[in-house]
Amino acid sequence: LHRLIRRQRQMCIRDSYGVQLFDLAGQTRPKAMYFSEVMSYIQLTGVIFPYISEPNINIHQPAYGISSTMCHELSHICGFMREDEANFISYLACYNSDNTELRYSGAMMGLIHATNRLYRYDPNAWQEIYTLLPEGVLRDLAANSRYWKKYETPVGETADRWNDAYLKANDQTDGVQSYGRMVDLLIAFYRAQGLI
């Protein structure tokens, strides 16, 4: 897995959008977290250690999420502290990449947040869209759900409450819901592009 994160980090560095994130972040490079499964138990895919500004990545998560997590954490290093903004910047960096794996990572992150939001508001529309997704994407979504379901424990719920309180204390009034607010930024972006 450490090789995987090194390879994905190298892809980010070579990619034009990834280069911009790495340039802005200075010499900071994401590192594989040795205790990645512990991060899964507390429902984290990445974290910045505040005093040394070091992005650490949960490499135990589904592999396609590693690149978007790296870009998300690098967005924080670049000064974008709001979770919705970091997710949106990560989406743009990955999705506009020349690398297929990076594009897929960003697309899956955007898809997961968008379909989760849609399901809350209109389960019928969600079902309609879900049936249109390619078989490989459906397999990855099912694997993602199975993976995170294993970590829905009292420890995870407590960590989620702590993260929610931390975000709210840092002026992100939506708390953990702010991660999914990237959908608002996606909609605004695609509207500005005249695509919706």
What are these language model-derived features?
Residues 20-24, 28, 35-40, 55-56, ...:
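A cross-kingdom signal targeting lumenal/periplasmic-facing segments of multi-pass membrane
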Residues 27-70:
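Active-site scaffold of zinc-dependent metalloenzymes
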Residues 68-80, 84-87, 91:
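Active-site recognition of the HExxH zinc-binding catalytic motif
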Residues 56-60, 71-78, 100-101:
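Second-shell loop/turn segments in exported
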Residues 88-140:
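Active-site/pore-lining binding-face segments in mid-to-C-terminal subdomains
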Residues 17-21, 59, 78, 82, ...:
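Sec/Tat-exported extracytoplasmic proteins
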Residues 1-13:
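Single conserved hydrophobic/aromatic residue that forms the stacking wall/gate
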Residues 136-196:
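Pan-zinc metallopeptidase signature
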